[in-house]
């Protein structure tokens, strides 16, 4: 088989050169379109299921949330195993699939299973899927630099403006907010006043719930004009909450302000984010989607941040605290320079030691063609250009050249033997 292949190649030299040129051209195209990252993604093929049930202990979360979900999700096909973690008010479940499984197929199967499993959960509890990213998907961290702005205001800017804008960037799976606190209206009841007015906690909660609502009406016509009726009932400030009636006592309404104190405050936090010991900060983590080019996504996010910065309040600006693009450029450029140096040194050594320019060229020309062809294979298997893959190519240069040297020396040896036989036959004929 090999002998026939070599014979066919020798008889069709132009075709061999044409195939080599085409292969090199496709290789250059593959190099330009290959994804770039600092490190390979070796994380597990997982789908995260997050469930929140505020105020419940870890044991209750384990018994009523985690256990039903884990037992239900174990029946999904192509699942290796299911891990879970229960904590105060939250449950995390990690469904680990086999490596060859498409991540979006896996997410659809988990979502399909959750539609039936959630019937076994307490009322009002709804599990959600985590972002469609990997364990190394955190590509950029940023904080908001302000001139003494309240942490609640910073978090509001992050949650209601910056986050939504950056999530629209192509390749971004999620922008996770951190730091500060989320503003909320807090109603602090006085037990003595509740007892005095004979009002229960549930009465206070129901009063707020029933009065914080809007409803639509029907359309009616008047003087040949159509009007749409709606009621406006959403609470807008502290005074409106304080004036809500709970019940009547001897024809006198008992209001929220009679039994409780209403204030604007931050939600209770389990931790804070401190930036280099300078104090608390508010920011976000940009998570990259499965299979995206990290370098391109970071560039797009930075471009979007420049647009978003124009709409920020005066004195507020972005401060990038972690940017993987610097690591990507330094690591990949370092390997590329090493690769070029190896190619030049190997080519020079081959030319010096072979002392035969035709043989040297036939060996040297294999290096760029083989490297270009290797990127075609990298793209075919969806492997990015990173430290490990480029280092492997650099180490393989010696093998590429060694193979060419052996073939050239063997060919030269066989030609010399054949030439000696021809010379011997020529002398005998004379």
Segment roles from a protein language model:
Residues 299, 307, 311, 328-337, ...:
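Cytosolic juxtamembrane regions of multi-pass inner-membrane proteins
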Residues 12, 109, 113, 304, ...:
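Short alpha-helical scaffold segments that flank and stabilize functional sites
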Residues 27-32, 37, 317, 344-412:
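Hydrophobic transmembrane alpha-helices and their membrane-interface caps
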Residues 1-343, 352, 358, 423-424:
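Membrane-proximal extracytoplasmic
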């Amino acid at each position: 088989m090999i002998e026939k292949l070599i014979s066919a190649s020798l008889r069709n030299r132009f075709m061999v050169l044409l195939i080599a040129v085409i292969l090199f051209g496709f290789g250059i195209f593959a190099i330009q379109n290959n994804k770039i990252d600092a490190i390979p993604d070796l994380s597990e093929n997982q789908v995260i299921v997050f469930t929140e049930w505020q105020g419940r202990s870890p044991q209750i979360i384990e018994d009523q949330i985690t256990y039903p979900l884990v037992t239900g999700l174990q029946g999904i096909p192509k699942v290796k195993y299911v891990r879970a973690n229960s904590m105060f008010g939250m449950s995390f479940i990690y469904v680990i699939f086999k490596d060859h499984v498409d991540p979006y197929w896996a997410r659809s199967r988990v979502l399909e299973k959750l539609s039936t499993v959630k019937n076994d959960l307490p009322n009002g509890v709804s599990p959600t899927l985590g972002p469609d990213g990997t364990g190394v998907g955190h590509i950029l961290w940023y904080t908001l630099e302000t001139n003494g702005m309240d942490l609640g205001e910073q978090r509001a800017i992050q949650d209601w403006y910056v986050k939504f804008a950056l999530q629209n960037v192509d390749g971004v799976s999620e922008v996770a907010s951190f730091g500060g606190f989320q503003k909320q209206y807090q109603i602090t009841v006085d037990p003595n006043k509740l007892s005095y007015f004979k009002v229960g906690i549930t009465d206070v909660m129901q009063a707020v719930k029933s009065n914080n609502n809007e409803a639509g009406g029907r359309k009616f016509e008047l003087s040949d004009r159509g009007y749409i009726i709606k009621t406006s009932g959403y609470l807008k400030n502290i005074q409106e909450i304080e004036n809500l009636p709970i019940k009547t006592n001897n024809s006198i309404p008992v209001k929220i302000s009679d039994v409780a104190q209403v204030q604007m405050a931050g939600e209770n936090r389990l931790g804070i984010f401190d930036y280099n010991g300078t104090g608390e900060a508010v920011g976000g983590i940009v998570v990259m989607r499965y299979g995206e080019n990290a370098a391109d996504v970071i560039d797009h996010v930075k471009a979007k941040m420049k647009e978003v910065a124009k709409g920020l309040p005066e004195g507020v600006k972005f401060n990038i605290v972690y940017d993987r693009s610097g690591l990507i450029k330094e690591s990949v450029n370092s390997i590329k320079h090493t690769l070029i140096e190896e190619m030049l040194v190997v080519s020079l050594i081959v030319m010096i030691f072979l002392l035969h320019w035709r043989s040297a060229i036939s060996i040297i020309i294999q290096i760029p063609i083989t490297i270009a062809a290797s990127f075609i294979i990298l793209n075919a298997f969806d492997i990015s250009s990173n430290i490990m893959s480029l280092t492997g190519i650099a180490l393989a240069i010696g093998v590429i050249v060694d193979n060419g040297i052996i073939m050239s020396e063997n060919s030269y040896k066989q030609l010399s033997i054949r030439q000696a036989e021809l010379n011997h036959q020529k002398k005998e004929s004379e």
